[in-house]
């Protein structure tokens, strides 16, 4: 072979340069490979990577649904485990039959079977973690462990009127005694005027043990918890503000902060009560929330069933600081307190000074964004858990509440200091709290607290006809 001269080297360099350009003649992409070759490559991927590969384009989606690939993944993940490597011959035969009949199933059959069983294993693991209950609240005591085991998180999906969607990952999360507080903030909010709804969804990884994998790229399924209408951000839903922020409440439990100057989104805070939170965050679909199974009344011949034996646990908190944490037992009502479709439970009475309680510290709703933070005075998050006589949660909520001026204690003696009240209501009941501001100690004292339960809920729960 003759040595290459300068002219030959120059021609070769030009050819290399041309071939490095993105042209149809020289480019070689995975999508140009035969399907048989692509299937061979996909067969080396694990389940998570295979699901991601199916999102590349329509061809990859169909190839990544191959039954022969998925039945091997299924068999490896859920093969029967026996000591000393012994496997039941019948189970081994079933596996062989499944491998032979994989081609007879519709495309994606074994992928669905694998994902169904994988999700069921996540739910089973969570059920074991969530089984121990707190004696006072009746709520799971290992919520933090359940979140760690499952990788459960929450996202909001903002929907524009033109059909566009914006999925936002949470920026902060804290677990309280009776609730979880999830916060979203950032600089990439779409213009509020273009948005119509906000979907709050639970987001659960299909595969456990992927906590180190960025949430955006790991396979997850969404469960719709609540759909909010952003058109309801009006003066009637405002709960307060400061020099930078106006804050609104959209029931149930959603706090929306708007920049005062721009009237654009600054943060969103979801307050989620722990009662059946995991079920609501995992068992729904992206479009339909999970519905709790209907309650079956306990057989009880007592003429006053449903009127006694209630237990209440109530918290008021914000930003990791609690100003109230109290439990109350043996709450009851008489038939004389059944009026206007409500049953009244007196928790704290004016007439018993020993029941009056202070709110510890400053009452305020803390907020933060990437650049600023602040506190909305006279607002707080209230978590309420009411258990009935059999220890089952009867009424639960986690929501912002406001301490507002009121005329004074409605049926009690005159107190020194200004009078305030806190009110909350939803479809199952309402709460009324009355407080007095003590100037000497600079703190609020709760001098009255009453719950009003809807008789329709009481009758449905206990099978009564009050």
From Swiss-Prot:
Keywords: Ubl conjugation pathway. It comes from the Eukaryota. GO terms for cellular component: SCF ubiquitin ligase complex. This is F-box only protein 15. It comes from Bos taurus (Bovine). The keyword Membrane does not apply. The keyword Thylakoid does not apply. It holds the Pfam family F-box-like. Directly interacts with SKP1 and CUL1. InterPro entries: F-box-like_dom_sf, F-box_dom. PROSITE patterns: FBOX (PS50181). SMART domains: FBOX. Residues 27-73 form the F-box domain. SUPFAM superfamilies: F-box domain. Substrate-recognition component of the SCF (SKP1-CUL1-F-box protein)-type E3 ubiquitin ligase complex. Transmembrane segments: none annotated.
């Amino acid at each position: 072979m003759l040595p290459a001269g300068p002219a030959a080297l120059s021609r070769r360099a030009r050819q290399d340069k041309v071939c490095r350009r993105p042209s149809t003649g020289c480019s070689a992409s995975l999508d140009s490979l035969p399907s048989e070759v692509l299937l061979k490559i996909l067969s080396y991927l694990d389940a998570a990577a295979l699901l991601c590969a199916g999102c590349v384009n329509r061809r990859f989606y169909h190839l990544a649904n191959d039954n022969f690939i998925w039945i091997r993944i299924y068999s490896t993940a859920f093969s029967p485990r026996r000591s000393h490597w012994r496997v039941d011959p019948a189970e081994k035969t079933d596996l062989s039959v499944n491998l032979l009949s994989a081609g007879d199933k519709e495309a994606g059959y074994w992928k669905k079977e694998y994902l169904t069983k994988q999700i069921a294993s996540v739910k089973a693991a969570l059920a074991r973690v969530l089984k121990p209950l707190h004696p006072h609240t009746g709520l799971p005591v290992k919520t933090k462990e359940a979140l760690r085991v499952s990788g459960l998180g929450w996202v909001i999906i903002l929907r524009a009127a033109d059909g566009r969607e914006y999925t936002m990952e949470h920026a902060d999360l804290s677990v309280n005694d009776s609730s979880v507080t999830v916060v979203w903030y950032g600089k990439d909010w779409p213009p509020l005027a273009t948005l119509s709804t906000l979907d709050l969804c639970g987001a659960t990884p299909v595969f456990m043990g992927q906590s180190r994998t960025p949430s955006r790229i790991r396979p997850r399924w969404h469960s719709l918890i609540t759909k909010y209408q952003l058109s309801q951000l009006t003066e009637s839903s405002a709960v307060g503000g400061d020099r930078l922020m106006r804050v609104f409440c959209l029931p149930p439990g959603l706090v929306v902060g708007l920049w005062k100057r721009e009237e654009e989104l600054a943060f969103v805070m979801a307050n989620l009560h722990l009662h059946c939170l995991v079920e609501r965050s995992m068992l729904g679909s992206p479009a339909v929330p999970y519905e709790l199974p209907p309650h079956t009344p306990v057989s009880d011949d007592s003429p006053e069933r449903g009127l006694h034996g209630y237990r209440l646990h109530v918290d008021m908190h914000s930003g990791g600081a609690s100003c109230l944490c109290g439990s109350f037992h043996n709450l009851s009502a008489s038939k004389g307190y059944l009026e206007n479709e409500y049953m009244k439970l007196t928790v704290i009475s004016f007439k018993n000074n020993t029941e009056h309680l202070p709110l510890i510290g400053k009452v305020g709703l803390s907020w933060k964004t990437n650049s600023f933070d602040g506190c909305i005075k006279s607002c707080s998050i209230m978590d309420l858990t009411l258990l009935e006589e059999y220890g089952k949660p009867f009424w639960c909520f986690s929501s912002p509440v406001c301490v507002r001026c009121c005329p004074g204690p409605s049926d009690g003696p005159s107190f020194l200091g200004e009078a305030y009240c806190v009110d909350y209501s939803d479809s199952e009941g309402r709460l009324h709290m009355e407080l007095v501001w003590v100037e000497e100690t600079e703190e609020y004292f709760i001098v009255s607290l009453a719950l009003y339960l809807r008789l329709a809920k009481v009758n449905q729960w206990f099978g009564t006809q009050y």
